[in-house]
């Protein structure tokens, strides 16, 4: 496998820490050891997160092409668009963000706080569009790209989640290589890695990266899209493409993609009672915050899998914390009593 052939623009602090979740593990019976890899703390650029790790491989391509404007898309409280805005500001580039109405949630300040507030503060041209949720290519995004060109700019197209992009899976191939180096220092290997999945390239990159040592199917995706068939297809397609690009040396198949569909409801961006319980439990036991859209759902999935005995006793499970906490302000009513 050859990740090193791809140029990388450093936007993160370096390898992210692995933190034992001792109190949460004990609360759940102590038979499974839980750890968190803190990609939510990976950068000083507007709180960072998993997209910042991905952007390290997209930015060299944008600069090589002479692009002057980063153009991306997400929901109103998109972590992706906030991270793209931060990177654009850091590099002195322009930024156009298409923010669609992906979440069926209504709050007076939903489009004025959290991620979208930060994007505006960092100088991004934020364009609100009423279209609903979908992880595919969007006309609103293509229109924004065309508008930049019409104004004489040179846009660089960054799809939702950085995912359906030729380089979108590389960052989390690097995540797997980083974990292997940390495992050597820790003196053990993780039996499972739990990760939230929506647009797919985070899990896809992990699948490829961990396939290098036979652990592709130990990456447990927790669907948060509530459209798992589409997410599964995209994970597999991106993983296959990424495996070819990094010269993995074997094909990625559907057996390598594990996606738990039980925790994504009721729909994208809306938490269920299990999501909220997991957010509060992790916060109160560990001081680790998660969000109602992504990490709260993957945390719920991991907690329930422990409770149901789906991880064998003695397992060491690594929770990939991808970020998302800046969206909490947009859901303040749900947590008005903590």
From Swiss-Prot:
Name under which the protein is recorded: 1-aminocyclopropane-1-carboxylate deaminase
Residues the record lists as N6-(pyridoxal phosphate)lysine modifications: 51
Subunit structure: Homotrimer.
EC number(s) from the headed UniProt entry: 3.5.99.7
Catalyzed reaction equations: 1-aminocyclopropane-1-carboxylate + H2O = 2-oxobutanoate + NH4(+)
Active site location: 78 (nucleophile)
Keyword tags: Hydrolase, Pyridoxal phosphate
A Pfam family: PALP
Cofactor requirements of the protein: pyridoxal 5'-phosphate
Top-level taxon of origin: Bacteria
InterPro entries cross-referenced by the UniProt entry: ACCD_DCysDesulf (IPR027278), ACP_carboxylate_deaminase (IPR005965), ACP_carboxylate_deaminase_bac (IPR020601), TrpB-like_PALP (IPR001926), TrpB-like_PALP_sf (IPR036052)
NCBIfam families: ACC_deam
Family: Belongs to the ACC deaminase/D-cysteine desulfhydrase family.
GO biological process terms held by the UniProt record: 1-aminocyclopropane-1-carboxylate metabolic process; amine catabolic process
Gene3D superfamilies: 3.40.50.1100
One example GO MF annotation: pyridoxal phosphate binding
Transmembrane region(s): none
């Amino acid at each position: 496998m050859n990740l090193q052939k791809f140029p990388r623009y450093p936007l993160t602090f370096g390898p992210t820490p692995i933190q034992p979740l001792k109190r949460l593990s004990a609360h759940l019976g102590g038979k499974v050891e839980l750890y968190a890899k803190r990609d939510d703390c990976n950068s000083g650029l507007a709180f960072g997160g998993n997209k910042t790790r991905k952007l390290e491989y997209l930015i060299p391509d944008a600069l090589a092409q002479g692009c002057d404007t980063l153009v991306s898309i997400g929901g109103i409280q998109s972590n992706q668009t906030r991270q793209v805005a931060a990177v654009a500001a850091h590099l002195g580039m322009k930024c156009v963000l298409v923010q669609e109405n992906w979440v069926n949630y209504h709050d007076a300040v939903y489009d004025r706080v959290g991620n979208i507030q930060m994007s505006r503060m960092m100088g991004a041209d934020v364009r609100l569009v009423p279209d609903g949720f979908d992880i595919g290519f969007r006309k609103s995004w293509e229109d924004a790209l065309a508008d930049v060109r019409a104004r004489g700019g040179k846009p660089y197209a960054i799809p939702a989640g950085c995912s359906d992009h030729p380089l979108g899976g590389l960052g989390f191939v690097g995540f797997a290589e980083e974990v292997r180096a940390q495992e050597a220092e820790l003196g053990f290997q993780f039996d499972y890695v739990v990760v939230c999945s929506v647009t797919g390239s985070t899990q896809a990159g992990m699948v490829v990266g961990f396939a290098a040592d036979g652990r592709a199917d130990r990456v447990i995706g927790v669907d948060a899209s509530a459209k798992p068939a589409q997410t599964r297809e995209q994970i597999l397609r991106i993983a296959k493409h990424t495996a070819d690009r990094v010269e993995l040396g074997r094909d990625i198949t559907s057996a390598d993609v594990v996606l738990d569909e039980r925790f994504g409801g009721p729909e994208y961006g809306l938490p269920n009672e299990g999501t909220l319980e997991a957010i509060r439990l992790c916060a109160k036991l560990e001081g680790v915050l998660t969000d109602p859209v992504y990490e709260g759902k993957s945390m719920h999935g991991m907690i329930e899998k422990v409770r149901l005995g789906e991880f064998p006793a003695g397992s060491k499970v690594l929770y990939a914390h991808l970020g998302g906490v800046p969206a909490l302000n947009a859901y303040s009513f749900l947590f008005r009593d903590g």
